[in-house]
């Protein structure tokens, strides 16, 4: 009995010595980093979403014959608006895929709109349009930066969740899994649209 108690005590002491290396705090820290970078991605996409109605109104005033393109942008924006966005998206690969697809469709629709605008020199000279175009360019750049930061944060988090010994803590203690990230193969989402007016 004494031997069993001393063996149990030895196992507990050895276990306590290795506990700091289990990665619990590291996983928690990386999880918070992923959430923070995701919030920034959401924030930038929301900014773009909010710019679109004003952009469509200005283009609509000058390009009345481009109804199909304007409807395409409005419908793509509507699909993005119907998505449930929040921290749950980064925990659910299917929701993340839908989010990514909707944002990609909106990017494509905006690109088509900018091609249409090229046919209307008076519109390109409009001060309101130039301001909106500048804001859209800046937002697209911020989206690219926010996505890159998110991808980097998810990569670091996923390493912790997959590598030994932190994978044991992730699986058995925290019950967490790898997080989804933007797919590099989806060109229309990976690259910001070229928006130039001269």
Give residue spans per PLM region.
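A helix-centric hydrophobic-segment signal that preferentially recognizes long
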Residues: 2-198
């Amino acid at each position: 009995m004494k031997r069993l108690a001393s063996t149990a005590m030895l196992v507990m002491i050895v276990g306590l010595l290795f506990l700091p290396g289990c990665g619990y705090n590291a996983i928690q820290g990386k999880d918070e980093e992923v959430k923070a970078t995701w919030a920034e991605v959401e924030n930038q996409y929301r900014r773009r979403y909010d710019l679109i109605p004003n952009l469509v109104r200005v283009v609509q005033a000058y390009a009345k014959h481009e109804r199909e393109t304007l409807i395409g942008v409005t419908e793509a924006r509507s699909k993005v608006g119907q998505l449930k966005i929040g921290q749950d998206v980064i925990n659910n690969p299917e929701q993340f895929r839908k989010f990514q697809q909707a944002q990609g469709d909106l990017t494509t629709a905006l690109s088509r709109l900018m091609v249409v605008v090229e046919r209307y020199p008076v519109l390109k000279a409009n001060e309101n349009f130039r301001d909106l175009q500048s804001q859209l360019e800046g937002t697209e750049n911020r989206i690219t930066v926010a996505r890159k930061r998110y991808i980097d944060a998810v990569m670091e988090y996923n390493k912790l969740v997959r590598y030994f010994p932190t994978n044991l803590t992730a699986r058995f203690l925290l019950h967490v899994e790898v997080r989804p990230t933007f797919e590099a193969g989806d060109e229309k989402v990976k690259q910001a649209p070229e928006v130039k007016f001269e």
